[in-house]
From Swiss-Prot:
Protein name, entry field: Homoserine kinase
Catalytic activities: L-homoserine + ATP = O-phospho-L-homoserine + ADP + H(+)
Keywords: Amino-acid biosynthesis, ATP-binding, Cytoplasm, Kinase, Nucleotide-binding, Threonine biosynthesis, Transferase
Pfam families xref list: GHMP_kinases_C (PF08544), GHMP_kinases_N (PF00288)
Gene Ontology cellular-component terms listed: cytoplasm
Organism taxonomic ancestry: Bacteria, Bacillati, Actinomycetota, Actinomycetes, Mycobacteriales
Gene3D superfamilies the UniProt entry points to: 3.30.230.10, GHMP kinase, C-terminal domain
Compartment(s) of residence: Cytoplasm
Regions annotated as coiled coil: none
Location, primary (coarse class): cytoplasm
Enzyme class: transferase
SUPFAM superfamilies, sorted: GHMP Kinase, C-terminal domain, Ribosomal protein S5 domain 2-like
Gene name of the record: thrB
């Protein structure tokens, strides 16, 4: 029998955004970034109240179909807990549908909030599993849960009847690695951008990406001079360039100047990993073309603060 939690219990969740793929690590590599959403969740006597401020305000639903609410309910179910009602207030800073893990952050925030309300019965592994299930891949969600860089993977059942199993392990990241996000002023649909990908690739391209993922792991951990080589890719970015021409142009411009630039997630954000600041002139050119520039650091894991009634 599920435990009913006390009215008045409240948690505040701070969850980082993330960048997925990092070039070659399609649906595998992720990196938590220092742009954050904050979600306040309180148990109330009845009903559901949802407020959203910042990114997504006026665009996302304010009912039970809101992703944070759905994730809270999934987390409560996994924790074998019930609540009579919920008040959910979202303060969003992660750009929505821009390739910075906004939907994964929402799922992580919801599951983490439920875990805090229920006095933390869920493990990190369970939170990765529950939040990744909303995405269908674990790279963004795992980065937001664990912080830093992650290697993630998915196990599918042979018969296709069981739910996919998601897992991840953290990677140490050199302290001097920073991220610069060039965020265009338009949304990209992950589904639409995935539709342009081929169903099969050549063995030589697969081999190319396997080697670059290995290089990228070494670059993050101990050899940041290899970041440019480690962000090369043949599995998804060449195909997505046709539907994201502005992003592709910026990635190519930056890479031609020696910067480790890549398409962040499904885009449209172009991300640069470096140990030195990007020159002001380059960033000013981006801003003048209508691109928002975010100078970021590698972030830690999701944080949950419990406020007792």
């Amino acid at each position: 029998m599920a435990i009913e939690l006390n009215v008045g219990r409240k948690v505040t969740v701070t969850v980082p955004g993330s960048s997925a793929n990092l070039g070659p690590g399609f649906d595998t590599l992720g990196l938590a970034l220092s742009v954050y959403d904050t979600v306040e969740v309180e148990i109330i006597p009845s009903g559901l109240e949802v407020e959203v401020f910042g990114e997504g305000q006026g665009e996302v639903p304010l009912d039970g179909s809101h992703l944070v609410v759905k994730a809270i309910r999934a987390g409560l179910k996994a924790a074998d807990a019930e609540v009579p009602g919920l008040r959910v207030v979202c303060h969003n800073n992660i750009p929505q549908s821009r390739g910075l893990g906004s939907s994964a952050a929402a799922a992580v925030a919801g599951v983490a909030a439920a875990n805090g309300l229920a006095d933390f019965p869920l493990t990190q592994e369970q939170i990765v599993q529950l939040s990744s299930a909303f995405e269908g891949h674990p790279d963004n969600a795992a980065a937001s849960v664990l912080g830093g860089a992650v290697v993630s993977w998915t196990n599918l059942s042979i018969d296709g009847k069981s739910q996919p199993q998601y897992a991840a392990v953290p990677l140490e990241v050199q302290d001097n690695i920073r991220a610069t996000a060039l965020v265009p002023n338009f949304h990209a649909s992950t589904e639409a951008v995935r539709r342009v990908l081929p169903t099969e690739v050549t063995h030589i391209d697969a081999r190319f990406n396997v080697s670059r993922v290995a290089v990228m792991i070494v670059a993050l951990q101990q050899r940041p001079d290899l970041l440019w080589e480690g962000t090369r890719d043949r599995l998804h970015q060449p195909y997505r360039a046709e539907v994201l021409p502005i992003t592709s142009e910026w990635v190519n411009r930056l890479r031609n100047r020696g910067y480790a630039a890549y398409l962040s997630g499904a885009g449209p954000t172009a991300m640069v990993l470096s140990t030195e600041p990007i020159p002001d002139k380059v960033l000013e050119d981006a801003r003048e073309s209508g691109i928002k520039v975010l100078e970021l650091e590698v972030a830690g894991p999701v944080k949950v603060e419990v406020n007792q009634p």
